[in-house]
Amino acid sequence: MMVTRTRKIHLHPRLETAAALLNALPENAVVADIGCDHGRLACALLQRNETWRCIASDVSAPSLEKARRLSANIGGEGRIDIRLGDGLTVLCRGEADAVVLCGMGGERIVELLDAADSPLMGARLAVMQPMRGVEELRAYLYISGYRILDDRVTEEAGRLYQILSAAPPCADGERDTWPADFPAGCFSLGYRAFERREPLCRTLARQQLLQTQKRLKTAANTGGEPVLRRKEAELLTILERWEH
């Protein structure tokens, strides 16, 4: 019986990267995993950080029941609060130090952030992993004044994913600024990953360039061509400056 209670939870690369972006949180931190599915991330965090507590929420009652069973298997029942609900509405202001929004579309993440009564419901950090719609998410974060803290690219099952962390807007309204060698206004890739010259970021830039150029072949003289031309120019600039 002790074997099941101490079984280490394995995370796939996307969630492992999300967990890494939470490492700077202090002791006794509270992490809210919004859209937790079966609760693997929350339970893994409890195993790795003995003083942390987690809030695991989802709109699916069957998923939450699986999360409840998993937390019981690792002996984490007393440190996890499982809640049925949608988005950040399950939180009271200030009760979580960090919120996690992984495995959903970027547009959906924007909806959940925008529907909150206050930015991140008082949390100091958000970790986000959009399955798609990353440009829409980054544009929203920039326009709303969120500050990008870190950016990662990870590979899972042959696909590249972007995972980013952000802090809520400053009271003075100051916005993020792009590095001098990164195209201002580029939302398709993360400039933090570019600054570190993260190898998978370069691979992703090449993939996006090929996809953009393929779309341009059928977008000539259409309303979408200028946007695609701009994206192509941004990606070419990133790749040209990579070695500098």
What are these regions (language model features)?
Residues 2-20, 89-90, 95, 107-244:
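Class I S-adenosyl-L-methionine
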Residues 28-37:
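Conserved class I S-adenosyl-L-methionine
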Residues 39, 43:
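Glycine-rich SAM-binding Motif I of class I
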Residues 46-47:
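Gly/Ala-rich phosphate-binding loop of Rossmann-like dinucleotide-binding domains
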Residues 53-58:
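Conserved SAM-binding motif I beta-strand of class I
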Residues 60-62:
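Conserved SAM/SAH-binding beta-strand->alpha-helix loop
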Residues 65-93:
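S-adenosyl-L-methionine
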Residues 96-103:
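Short SAM/SAH-binding signature in class I
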